[in-house]
Amino acid sequence: MLKQLLSKCAEGKALTEDEAYAAMNIIMSGEATDSQIASLLSMLRLRGETVDELVGFVRAMRDRMTAIEASDDVIDTCGTGGDGAATFNVSTAAAIVISSLGVKVAKHGNRAVSSKSGSADVLERLGIDIHTSPSAAKQALETKGLAFLFAPLYHAAMKHAAGPRKEIGFRTVFNLIGPLANPARCKRQVVGVYSTCYAEKLAEAMRRLGSEHVLFVTGRDGLDECSIAAETDVVELKDGAI
């Protein structure tokens, strides 16, 4: 089936939500070759991912992830990365600061793939154990107000795409859908996005996926952050309206 979906993409056609769901399931089950995964990621990047594709991919990720129970007031600060600016990991610093103010943060993150520093890289350099179990993460969230959810532990099936992602090096759809698949199922987030166009797509995708209040920020200088060197565009999803 994946060959048929690849052929459809090669013709410049977009996948339906169900087709995207099926493609991601094939990847996560280990049935896709590295070449097939790299081909799909490259074609999607060149054409531009649609909202239907994003929703289908995220649904598949959520269905296979190891989730943790969390209260409705938990938030996440996460970015797409891949802006090429080599800035420090702002979302991790922001998570630490706001948790000290009493906000519960389930910080979802990974090591760097298409950027210089991921949140896991930062925390490891600080001497923090990132390989915490779901039960330990849940307890930390309840007692300390901050937990780090290391993506490979909660999205174990994504290991099949790790090699192709690293080899091709550029940002892919995984940069976009990672922030949408928090294991704590956060419905409130601040998401840094490297493109306002994609911020709007992600807002619509998260609306369809049930998020309640999400801010998507994009610096006009290309940062997936609130920029201090240029104006910042903000796309807000709140109570079903964008």
UniProtKB/Swiss-Prot annotation:
Superkingdom field: Bacteria
Keyword Metal-binding: yes
Record's keyword terms, sorted: Amino-acid biosynthesis, Aromatic amino acid biosynthesis, Glycosyltransferase, Magnesium, Metal-binding, Transferase, Tryptophan biosynthesis
Binding site for 5-phospho-alpha-D-ribose 1-diphosphate: 79, 82-83, 87, 89-92, 107-115, 119
Co-factor remark: Binds 2 magnesium ions per monomer.
Gene3D superfamilies hit by this protein: Nucleoside phosphorylase/phosphoribosyltransferase catalytic domain, Transferase, Pyrimidine Nucleoside Phosphorylase, Chain C
One BP annotation, GO: L-tryptophan biosynthetic process
Similarity field: Belongs to the anthranilate phosphoribosyltransferase family.
Protein name according to UniProt: Anthranilate phosphoribosyltransferase
Biological source species: Bacillus caldotenax
Lineage: Bacteria, Bacillati, Bacillota, Bacilli, Bacillales
Gene (UniProt): trpD
